[in-house]
Each structure stands twice: as structure tokens, then as C-alpha cells.
């Protein structure tokens, strides 16, 4: 659904709430080609590891423009946040239910917002707008498994997410 069609579609749904399926079908269009798909083989190869250090090593060793561009982008991001993201992806692939994932996501988010890198990211992008965050730890190697385990610690039952 193109963004330009939203006002018209909203008005049509408001006028005929029972016709949502037909309205959305009539307004839908094929998605444009995603340029990222042109790099699918590179992405699958370069990002195959479950560790950030190995992803960085693969990008550094590749020598291609795409790998160099991605490495440059990743080096501006919080090493802690990237390691948290990799762990969430890995753990999520093993979970049996959406509720289990939500429990973990909520606990992780609760811990992350209390840490330096979250506050530093807010400072660099929203407050000072200098886009020069000073991450701590500053490198993937400095983000220890112990630190990540602390971020993934379950919340006490009274604070944990529940589906109700």
C-alpha cells in the first residue's frame, strides 16, 4: 500500500468498515524491487557467524565494496547493542513461543535502557545531535560475555512481562 494512498484508504474504511478486505486489495500494489536482495549471497556469507568479532573479520577479509560499506556502518554502532542483537536473534530462533520471546525482549530492553550506551546514543542523536557517540565498551572485543549475560538476566517475577 503506497503511503500516498493512506488518506484515501482511511476515508474508504471509515465509510465502509465491513469492506476492509476489498478496500485494501483494491489499493494494494506490488512492492518495488528491494536493492538489498541484490546482495543476498554476500549477506548470507558475511553475516553467517553468531559472533560480532567473526562478522567483523569476514567483512574485513572480504575486500569488496559492499563489505567495506557495511563494516564502516557497523563501526559507528554500539558494540554492546550489536552483540545484544545477535544474541536476541540466536535465542529467538530456539524459543518455543512468542510469549517466551516477549519475556526476554522486555527484560533485555529493561536492562539496556539503564546502561551507558543507550543514554549515550540518545545524547549523540537527540540531545546534542553531534552524531558522535562514545560507546563504552568501545570495541566488540571489550564487550564481555559477562556483560551480555547481565543484560539477558531475567527480571524478578513481579517486574517481568506477562501476556495479560
Q: Which residues make up each language-model segment?
A:
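Terminal peptide-recognition signature
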Residues: 1, 85, 125
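Short acidic/histidine-centered micro-motifs embedded in hydrophobic/aromatic stretches
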Residues: 9-12, 58, 88, 124, ...
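Short alpha-helix boundary/capping motifs
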Residues: 17-21, 113, 153-154
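C-terminal amphipathic alpha-helical interaction region
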Residues: 108, 116, 120-164
Amino acid at each position: 500500500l503506497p503511503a500516498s494512498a493512506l488518506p484515501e484508504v482511511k476515508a474508504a474504511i471509515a465509510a465502509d468498515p465491513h469492506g476492509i478486505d476489498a478496500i485494501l486489495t483494491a489499493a494494494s500494489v506490488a512492492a518495488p524491487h528491494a536493492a538489498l536482495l541484490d546482495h543476498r549471497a554476500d549477506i548470507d556469507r558475511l553475516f553467517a557467524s553468531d559472533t560480532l568479532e567473526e562478522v567483523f573479520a569476514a567483512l574485513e577479509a572480504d575486500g569488496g565494496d559492499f563489505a567495506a560499506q557495511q563494516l564502516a556502518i557497523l563501526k559507528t554502532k554500539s558494540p554492546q547493542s550489536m552483540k545484544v542483537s545477535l544474541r536476541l536473534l540466536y535465542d529467538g530462533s530456539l524459543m518455543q513461543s512468542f510469549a517466551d520471546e516477549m519475556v526476554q525482549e522486555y527484560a533485555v530492553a529493561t536492562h539496556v535502557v539503564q546502561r551507558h550506551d543507550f543514554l549515550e546514543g540518545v545524547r549523540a542523536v537527540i540531545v546534542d545531535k553531534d552524531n558522535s557517540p562514545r560507546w563504552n565498551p568501545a570495541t566488540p572485543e571489550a564487550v564481555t560475555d559477562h556483560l551480555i549475560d547481565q543484560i539477558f538476566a531475567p527480571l524478578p517475577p513481579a517486574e517481568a512481562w506477562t501476556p495479560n
